[in-house]
């Protein structure tokens, strides 16, 4: 079982903590989420603590990341979306650093666990719902009845739209967790075959591993982007009632 491709996703307790009957132990997942947050904060602190008119490469890279998130909000929501930059930016950076941290040898990918991604998705879902009711009041409920729907079809459409709305955090979290888990399992399996092939083909299989790692890094970045862009689209639905 120790050589199973799924063994890398095992949750291991590091510090056993129980409070009011709940198990809130500090695990390997906890430490990698904390580490991802610390690395992100350190990166942006080093990039911006001594900003210059002629920016350093680190500052330029941080500004590119910030502008990427700002552009996502601008394109999906417009000026009204600027107030959500702190939330959306934090989500993007946390997912991005967690995904990339999971690519390091002998590490742990927190975003491969549905409980982590579902928590992030619930934050988005609750924000969208609260913003919708605060901005539009009960008119927000018209989101569940598309304009021009015939009266006889209204009950069915309301049920379908409500189910679709409630399924958003599930699909958002499953997409991220499933992609991260599938990528790591595939990499683990192929790496195992490659080690066996090296007995006969010497160093020839190594480029295959390098290509796969490069592809997995691309997927890690892409999944952070997809999670964020979908969050922006959901916010747009609440703000502009689309």
Swiss-Prot record:
The organism's superkingdom is given as Bacteria
| Annotated compartments | Cell inner membrane
Q: Which InterPro entries match?
A: ATP_synth_F0_asu (IPR000568), ATP_synth_F0_asu_AS (IPR023011), ATP_synth_F0_asu_bact/mt (IPR045083), F0_ATP_A_sf (IPR035908)
Q: Which family does this protein fall into?
A: Belongs to the ATPase A chain family.
Entry's Gene3D superfamilies? ATP synthase, F0 complex, subunit A
Q: Which UniProt keywords apply?
A: ATP synthesis, Cell inner membrane, Cell membrane, CF(0), Hydrogen ion transport, Ion transport, Membrane, Transmembrane, Transmembrane helix, Transport
Q: Look up and give the organism this protein is from.
A: Rickettsia akari (strain Hartford)
Q: How does it assemble?
A: F-type ATPases have 2 components, CF(1) - the catalytic core - and CF(0) - the membrane proton channel. CF(1) has five subunits: alpha(3), beta(3), gamma(1), delta(1), epsilon(1). CF(0) has three main subunits: a(1), b(2) and c(9-12). The alpha and beta chains form an alternating ring which encloses part of the gamma chain. CF(1) is attached to CF(0) by a central stalk formed by the gamma and epsilon chains, while a peripheral stalk is formed by the delta and b chains.
Query: Could you tell me what this protein does?
Result: Key component of the proton channel; it plays a direct role in the translocation of protons across the membrane.
Q: What are the TM regions of this chain, as residue ranges?
A: 29-49, 84-104, 114-134, 140-160, 181-201, 203-223
Classify the protein's membrane topology as the record does: Multi-pass membrane protein
Spell out the protein name for this chain: ATP synthase subunit a
């Amino acid at each position: 079982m120790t050589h199973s491709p799924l063994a890398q996703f095992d949750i291991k307790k590091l510090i056993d903590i129980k409070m009011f009957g709940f198990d809130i132990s500090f695990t390997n997942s906890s430490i990698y989420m904390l580490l991802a947050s610390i690395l992100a904060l350190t990166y942006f602190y080093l990039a911006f603590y001594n900003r210059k008119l002629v920016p350093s490469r680190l500052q330029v890279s941080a500004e590119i990341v910030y502008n990427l998130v700002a552009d996502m909000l601008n394109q999906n929501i417009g000026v009204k979306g600027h107030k959500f930059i702190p939330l959306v930016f934090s989500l993007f950076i946390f997912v991005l650093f967690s995904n990339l941290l999971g690519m390091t040898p002998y590490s742990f990918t927190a975003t491969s666990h549905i409980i982590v991604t579902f928590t992030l998705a619930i934050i988005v879902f609750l924000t969208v719902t609260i913003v919708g009711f605060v901005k539009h009041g009960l008119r927000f409920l018209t989101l569940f009845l598309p304009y021009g729907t015939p009266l006889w079809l209204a009950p069915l459409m309301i049920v379908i739209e409500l189910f679709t709305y409630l399924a958003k955090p599930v699909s958002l979290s499953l997409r991220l967790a499933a992609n991260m888990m599938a990528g790591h399992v595939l990499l683990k399996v192929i790496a195992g075959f490659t080690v066996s092939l090296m007995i006969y083909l010497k160093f020839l299989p190594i480029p295959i591993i390098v290509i796969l790692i490069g592809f997995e890094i691309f997927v890690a970045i892409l999944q952070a982007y997809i999670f964020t862009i979908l969050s922006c689209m959901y916010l747009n639905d609440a703000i502009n009632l689309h």
